[in-house]
């Protein structure tokens, strides 16, 4: 972790992170916790939540599915009680969705991907905004993807929702900017971890290739020829929460090694 960023994060920042018990979300939570932030997270994985409770008992947790507006309402009620307010929302929850040609994607898979990736951002943003209005350092960070600017063959539901998050971010930046609320999107590339391995496996099956061939092909489209570490995403979150980003809003910031095509 870059100590320069840590030094510029306000101690005691009140943060909500969705899907914060595992994966990228967990790394973001750990980075913010190191900075002295007060954090409340939601996740659908009860085992991951239990592990987070054991490792970081100071972090508040709620088991909730962001695709369900009523569960989001309960989550925010618990988070507000725990934190006493809100300075930062990290809209991290998302799913990979199906890997298939458009005519092989079921309406149910399409709707589930939209429900989690896009509706979930909306449900959380609408609950966070009244709280952020009372913050002197109000920040909303939405997790999109490089697929949200390039498209992604055989991953149409995922790419469509991630494009949607970019439009969602830019619209809210204009709407909420006059109230001092900064809104940005982070666009990760190939982030190391179980999710990208599942994506590679599904793509290999769809394309009739080996997983090694798919990974090599995907990395050949990255200028730096390497994957992204979850901590790289956490570093960007820290920066966007810092005073150094006080005039950054409405931006879609890629952390991807320069993905040229997908």
State the predicted function of each range.
Residues 125, 161, 169:
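Active-site helix of classical SDR
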């Amino acid at each position: 972790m870059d100590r320069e960023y840590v030094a510029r994060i306000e101690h005691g920042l009140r943060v909500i992170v969705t899907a914060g018990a595992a994966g990228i979300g967990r790394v973001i939570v750990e980075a913010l916790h190191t900075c002295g932030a007060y954090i409340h997270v939601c996740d659908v994985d009860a085992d991951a939540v239990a592990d987070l409770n054991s490792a970081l008992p100071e972090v508040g947790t709620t088991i909730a599915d962001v695709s369900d507006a009523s569960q989001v309402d309960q989550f925010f009620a618990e988070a507000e009680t725990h934190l006493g307010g809100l300075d930062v929302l990290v809209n991290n929850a998302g799913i990979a969705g199906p890997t298939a040609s458009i005519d092989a994607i079921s309406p149910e898979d399409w709707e589930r991907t939209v429900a989690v990736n896009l509706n979930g951002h909306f449900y959380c943003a609408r609950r966070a905004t009244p709280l952020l209005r009372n913050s002197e350092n109000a920040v909303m960070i939405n997790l999109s993807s490089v697929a949200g600017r390039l498209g992604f063959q055989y991953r149409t539901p995922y790419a469509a929702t991630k494009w949607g998050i970019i439009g969602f971010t830019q619209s809210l930046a204009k709407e909420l900017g006059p109230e001092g609320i900064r809104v940005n999107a982070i666009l990760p590339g190939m982030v190391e971890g179980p999710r990208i391995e599942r994506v590679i496996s599904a793509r290999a099956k769809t394309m009739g290739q080996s997983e090694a061939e798919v990974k090599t092909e995907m990395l050949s489209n990255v200028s730096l020829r390497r994957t992204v570490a979850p901590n790289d995403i956490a570093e960007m979150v820290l920066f966007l929460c810092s005073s150094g980003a006080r005039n950054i809003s409405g931006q879609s910031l890629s952390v991807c090694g320069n993905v040229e095509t997908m």
